[in-house]
Amino acid sequence: MSLLTLFPAILSFIAVSVPDEGRDMYDAFVNKLANSFVSVSYEYETEISGVKVVGEGNLFLQGRCYRYDADGLTVCSDSRSIWIADQAAREMVIEPVDESSLAVNPATLLVNLAGAFTVKSTKKAGDGVVIYHLLPAVSFGISECSITLAASGTQGASCAAPVLQKASFITDDGIAFSLVIKSVTFEEPSRSPEFFLPSGTDSDWVVTDLR
């Protein structure tokens, strides 16, 4: 699976076991995330075979549905199926949601909050800012992860919930991936499943439907 397709896991694979320091902010973030339509704009950086790779993307989450776009790759799910579209190649693969695979269906954990991550430790990084070091409770391609949350009103956080500022993770094969969150917005969860479906395809596209 592409590194880019792991990003929703950073938001979704969240355990409820948190050390006392930062617990209230962490719980508030999880609750807001699970009960909102969430929009995230981010920049990412990684290194593959000695080559630095940078890019940016946008992610939308609501319950078990999600859609994100990053450098020509679009991945969508309406909770029943997953669409993976390569805009440059004009190719799309459609697969059924695999309820047993956290990496394929990361948004499932927004509803269930199954403990895919446990919090190993926390560290203050400024007034109202906490770094959470996470370890996977199950195997899904990420060996370790950290997220940085800022309390509302601190260091650029302007919404009513704690804000995800940064995230980083290391895959099982040792590739490090870091993200800087440009913006996060929370709205009422009023989007229909159709909002998350892909658009802009025509008869020139090669579509492989594996459902």
Residue ranges and their predicted role:
Residues 29-32, 56-60, 64, 71-76, ...:
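Short linear motifs in intrinsically disordered
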Residues 3, 7-53, 64, 199-211:
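N-terminal leader/targeting segments and the immediate start of mature chains
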